[in-house]
Each structure stands twice: as C-alpha cells, then as structure tokens.
UniProtKB/Swiss-Prot annotation:
Function (record text): Component of the ubiquinol-cytochrome c reductase complex (complex III or cytochrome b-c1 complex) that is part of the mitochondrial respiratory chain. The b-c1 complex mediates electron transfer from ubiquinol to cytochrome c. Contributes to the generation of a proton gradient across the mitochondrial membrane that is then used for ATP synthesis.
Co-factor: note: Binds 2 heme b groups non-covalently.
Its membrane topology: Multi-pass membrane protein
A Pfam family hit: Cytochrom_B_C
Domain of life assignment: Eukaryota
Coiled-coil region: none
The protein's assembly and partners: The cytochrome bc1 complex contains 11 subunits: 3 respiratory subunits (MT-CYB, CYC1 and UQCRFS1), 2 core proteins (UQCRC1 and UQCRC2) and 6 low-molecular weight proteins (UQCRH/QCR6, UQCRB/QCR7, UQCRQ/QCR8, UQCR10/QCR9, UQCR11/QCR10 and a cleavage product of UQCRFS1). This cytochrome bc1 complex then forms a dimer.
Compartment(s): Mitochondrion inner membrane
Protein name: Cytochrome b
Length: 381
C-alpha cells in the first residue's frame, strides 16, 4: 500500500514542501531563517489574536486597555511582551535572511526575490500600524510624523494624508483603521509567504557555493527538520529571555505616557528596526527628497538582480565583493545608530555620509567589484 502522505491531496502538498523535498546537502545555518520567519509569523498571529480579544481601538480607552491586558488578563503581560519582542525577532531574522540572499546571490531567483522584497515592505507596514495601537506618546507622534510624509507628494499630498487620517489630524478614525489594517495584514503576509515558497520550490534552494546542487541532494526530513528545530530552539530562547527579563529594553520610554497632541516628545524616533531608513530620511534636507530616499532604501533591493555583473553567483570566492558586503553591513549599523540620535553635530554630518555610502556600495561599487573579479579570473598568459 502506498504511503498516505504521498497520495492524500492535502498531505501530498505538505510532504512535497517539508518532508520529501530534495535540498542541497551543503546549506549552512544561514538557510535557517526562512523557517524561523515562518515561526515568527505564527507566534505574532497567535499572540496578536489573544491581544485583540482584550484591546479596544478607541482613543479614550486604547492606552488603558493595554494596561488592563498587562495587569488583569491571565498572562496578559507575557502575551504582550512576546508580541512586542516577537516583532524585534521577526525583523532580526528578516534582515539576516535578506543579508544571506545578497551574500550568496539568492536574488538571482528573481520571482522569489521580488515577492520577498514586497513581503519585507508589507511586514514593515504592519509593524508601523501596530506600533500606533498602544496610543502612547511615541505611537501618536510616530503616526503623525510618518503619515505626514505623504504630504510631500505633489498636488494630491495633503488630500491623501487627510484621507488616511480620516480627519484633519491623527485621531479616533486613524486608530480604528490602523487596528483594522494591523489585523488583516498578517493574513495577507501569510498568503504572500505561500507564493514566496511556491516560487522557491520551482527552482530549489541556492547553496553557499552558488553552484548547481542537483548532483547532490538530500531529503529535507530528517536532516533539515532537525537543523531548523535547533535554530527554532535558539530563537525561542532569545525571545523568552527578552520577554521575561528585559521586555522594555527595545521599546521607547515615551510610550509609557498616554498620547498627548499638545506635548511633543523631545526626540521622535521609530523602533530600532526602522532606524536605518529613518536616518536616510532625515539625512536629506528636502521633504520630498527624503521621502524618495526612504522608499529607495528598500526598493533598491528590487534592482540588485539587475546589477549582478560577476560570473560567480555567491560571494564565497570573491574577496573584493566580500569586503564591500561587510562595509555595507557596518554602514547599516552606523545608520541605525544615527537614526536614534538627536539632530545635532556631529550626527547630522555622519547621517548623509552613511546614506551616500549605502547607495554607492549597492549601486556602483558592488557591480564594479564583480567586473574587476571577472577580469582577475582571466588567465594572463
């Protein structure tokens, strides 16, 4: 009798995606982040669902409903801390996943890469509307500042902002619709993840060498299920340590004060995972220019496949490109640091320099390094 998991219409899909999937034999721990992101999404949807059972999306009661969750709901404090820090884990895994894609040339799977970039943007949008929901000071002013950026769009800007606000300022209508968006977006993300996997399984996984792995494949289960389980265990450990011991380490103290439209916080800044983009936004003294640079900082990922000049796929055997990759990584750390600093000397000089370096490395230096490395491969005798 044939095995049920290979014949049953539903189980066959699961089997082909997670059990009998042929995987390259040499993929490293950098390939763990896809499954970790899937787990993060499940954790966020589940904790978010339980939070939504007790949360009220009204300006008068939103802040106190979050306090009520933490004080009066059974394990509400834990659910809230897991959800807030789960977002940080989500973005940590996302950045490492994208970094892996750039380092090993996975972006040459163009469909998978493009849907991945759209996923990144959607997750960022979800995190932004979610941050507004507790209705603290930084929630309110973050929403005001970021939505206001749309007013830089010529002609329709102001109308667009007021349409998104549902009035003439960030108020009750804004909070209600942001809650609706925050609830629906994770399910849209889940659908997009399935499409992401669908495209990936059309080609099969890339591997560290960047060579075609078809000659040496192993089944996903048990080899990579156990490997992913180790990664999962480590991520859950870090998440629990964060949620149990230092739940507010990555948050902003201003968000412990209820939203007050009459009192602006001294430093308006987003959560750590948006700081690099915020630094790029602030480094341009023109409003529209800043908004375009902010968009470009993420959308530049879409043109990376077009800028691939090397004969080799991976950076594994390309020392010049490797150096540039780690320079780019350091540059992103600098941008993250600058995004969290006040607008004063010397930070206002470092910001534009780091922003220029970011675009210069991706758009010019990396493609140039690929050409130089191609030339170095040619026999000279």
């Amino acid at each position: 009798m044939t095995n049920l998991r290979k014949t049953h219409p539903l189980m066959k899909i699961v089997n082909d995606a997670f059990i009998d999937l042929p995987a390259p034999s040499n993929i490293s721990a950098w390939w763990n982040f896809g499954s970790l992101l899937g787990i993060c999404l499940v954790i966020q949807i589940l904790t978010g669902l339980f939070l939504a059972m007790h949360y009220t999306s009204d300006t008068l009661t939103a802040f106190s409903s979050v306090a009520h969750i933490c004080r009066d709901v059974n394990y509400g404090w834990l659910i809230r801390n897991l959800h807030a820090n789960g977002a940080s884990m989500f973005f940590m895994c996302l950045f490492l996943h994208v970094g892996r894609g750039i380092y090993y040339g996975s972006y040459l799977f163009k469909e998978t890469w493009n849907i991945g970039v759209i996923l990144l943007l959607t997750v960022m949008a979800t995190a932004f509307v979610g941050y507004v929901l507790p209705w603290g000071q930084m929630s309110f002013w973050g929403a005001t500042v970021i939505t206001n950026l749309l007013s830089a769009i010529p002609y329709i800007g102001t109308t667009l902002v007021e349409w998104i606000w549902g009035g003439f300022s960030v108020d009750k209508a804004t909070l209600t619709r942001f809650f609706a968006f925050h609830f629906i977006l994770p399910f849209i993300i889940t659908a997009m993840v399935i499409v992401h996997l669908l495209f990936l399984h059309e080609t099969g996984s890339n591997n560290p060498s960047g060579l075609n792995p078809d000659s040496d494949k192993i089944p996903f289960h048990p080899y990579y299920t156990i490997k992913d389980a180790l990664g999962l265990l480590m991520m859950i450990l870090i998440l629990l340590l964060l949620a149990m011991f230092t739940p507010d380490m990555l948050g902003d103290p201003d968000n412990f004060s209820p939203a007050n439209p009459l009192n602006t916080p001294p430093h308006i800044k987003p959560e750590w995972y948006f700081l690099f983009a915020y630094a790029i936004l602030r480094s341009i003294p023109n409003k529209l220019g800043g908004v375009l640079a902010l968009l470009a900082s993420i959308l530049v990922l879409l043109i990376i496949p077009l800028l691939h000049t090397s004969k080799q796929r991976s950076l594994m055997f390309r020392p010049i490109s490797q150096t540039l990759f780690w320079l780019l990584t350091a540059d992103l750390f600098i941008l993250t640091w600058i995004g969290g600093q006040p607008v004063e000397q010397p930070f206002i000089i470092i910001g534009p320099v780091a922003s220029i370096m970011y675009f210069l490395i991706i758009l010019a230096l990396m493609p140039l390094a690929g050409l130089i490395e191609n030339y170095m491969l040619k026999p000279k005798w």
